Amino acid sequence: KECMADGTVCYIHNHNDCCGSCLCPNGPLARPWEMLVGNCKCGPKA
């Protein structure tokens, strides 16, 4: 299965599809909400 390139918006349902990690700006507590609203993007593996 293809993985999503860095810079692609990642959501709860597909954050594991990033080639690297799904990176969210405001840390772990806000993460579920940020994924919901589309604030997270695929980036290099953490």
Swiss-Prot record:
Expressed by the venom gland. It comes from the Eukaryota. Its main location: secreted. InterPro entries: Insecticidal_knottin-like_sf, Toxin_28. Keywords: Disulfide bond, Knottin, Secreted, Toxin. Disulfide bonds join 3-19, 10-22, 18-42, 24-40. Residues 31-33 are annotated as: Keys region for toxin activity. It is found in: Secreted. One of its GO terms (molecular function) is toxin activity. One of its GO terms (cellular component) is extracellular region. It holds the Pfam family Toxin_28. The presence of a 'disulfide through disulfide knot' structurally defines this protein as a knottin. Insecticidal toxin. It inhibits insect voltage-gated sodium channels (Nav) by partially blocking the channel pore in DUM neurons from the American cockroach, not by acting as a gating modifier. The inhibition is only partially reversible after prolonged washout. In vivo, the toxin causes flaccid paralysis followed by death when injected into Heliothis virescens larvae. It also causes uncoordinated movements followed by full paralysis to sheep blowflies (Lucilia cuprina). Belongs to the neurotoxin 16 (SFI) family. This is Mu-segestritoxin-Sf1h. It comes from Segestria florentina.
